[in-house]
């Protein structure tokens, strides 16, 4: 039986969330539940056929069960819809909308990465109306220095992959799961991804791509909320909607998402480049693109 909040408590929570929204706070994070926390006992109603009231009967008279009253459904306000309302949703220009998200991100101190040596926040770059979006895991040293995703050796390989598709880097949008460089170029921790990814979801809702390519396991697992291997994740499309936000465009209700290897991995194991090209060809077919003819 699903639990429902007391209507008065629900209205109070909705009012509190609106209050935070008016202060410019739009993202909320769940506290981990203590293992010692006890379960709240929820009374379970008996089946109506079992509900009967004892009453005096004359000899030979049978007792008949009294039908249980059926409560009218309660129409409750969905407080989580309040959380989903973002300031950029009232702006039709995607450039301005992305700027609002960047300003909301600010000089972010929401997770430990801000005090572990980052130089700057690496937000995202590219065409704000792109049909194709690439999402990596996080900035490296070169990205941290230049403030733009995928500008180092892995970025050069990504540029070549994009050119092989017959388009230029400027035609796509590129971002990462986390926007601060993890120390030593380590993989982002799960809590860091959970803290930063709401801003990425908002970027996706503004750009409204037709296809997202998740580069590497961290990006794929975070976006899809799946803990599967790359072998299991690759080779197919997933229906994707950015969690926690809604697009202000009624004609956009999510996109396709494909998974391929991260360019940094391909630098370490060039034998997998052919597999990555298969993934990109699948994306090209979905977008109606044709590979450019080889020149001699």
Where do the PLM segments sit?
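Terminal amphipathic helices with adjacent charged low-complexity linkers/tails
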Residues: 35-38
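Charged, compositionally biased N-terminal leader segments and the immediate start
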Residues: 1-12
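A polyanion-binding, active-site-adjacent surface
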Residues: 11, 19, 26-31, 41-296
């Amino acid at each position: 039986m699903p639990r429902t909040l007391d209507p008065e408590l629900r209205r109070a929570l909705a009012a509190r969330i609106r209050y935070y929204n008016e202060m410019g706070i739009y993202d909320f994070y769940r506290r981990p539940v203590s293992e010692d926390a006890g379960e709240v006992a929820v009374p379970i109603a008996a089946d109506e056929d079992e509900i009967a009231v004892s009453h005096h009967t004359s000899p030979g008279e049978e007792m008949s069960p009294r039908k249980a009253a059926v409560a009218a459904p309660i129409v409750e306000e969905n407080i989580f819809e309040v959380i989903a309302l973002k300031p950029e949703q009232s702006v039709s220009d995607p450039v301005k909308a992305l700027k609002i998200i960047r300003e909301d991100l600010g000089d972010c101190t929401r997770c430990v990465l801000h005090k572990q040596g980052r130089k700057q926040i690496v937000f995202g770059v590219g065409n704000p109306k792109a049909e194709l979006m690439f999402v990596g895991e996080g900035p490296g040293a070169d990205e941290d220095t230049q403030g733009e995703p995928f500008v180092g050796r892995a970025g050069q390989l990504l540029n070549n992959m994009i050119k092989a598709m017959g388009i230029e880097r400027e035609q796509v949008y590129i971002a990462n799961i986390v926007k601060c460089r993890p120390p030593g170029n380590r993989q982002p921790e799960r809590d860091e991804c959970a803290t930063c990814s709401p801003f990425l979801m908002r970027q996706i809702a503004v750009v409204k791509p037709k296809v997202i390519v998740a580069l590497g396991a961290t990006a794929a697992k975070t976006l899809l909320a799946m803990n599967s291997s790359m072998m299991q994740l690759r080779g197919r499309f997933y229906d994707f909607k950015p969690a926690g936000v809604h697009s202000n465009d009624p004609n956009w209700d999510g996109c396709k998402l494909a998974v391929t290897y991260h360019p940094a991995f391909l630098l370490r194991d060039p034998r997998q480049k052919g597999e990555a090209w298969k993934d990109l060809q699948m994306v090209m077919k979905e977008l109606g693109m044709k590979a450019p003819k080889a020149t001699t």
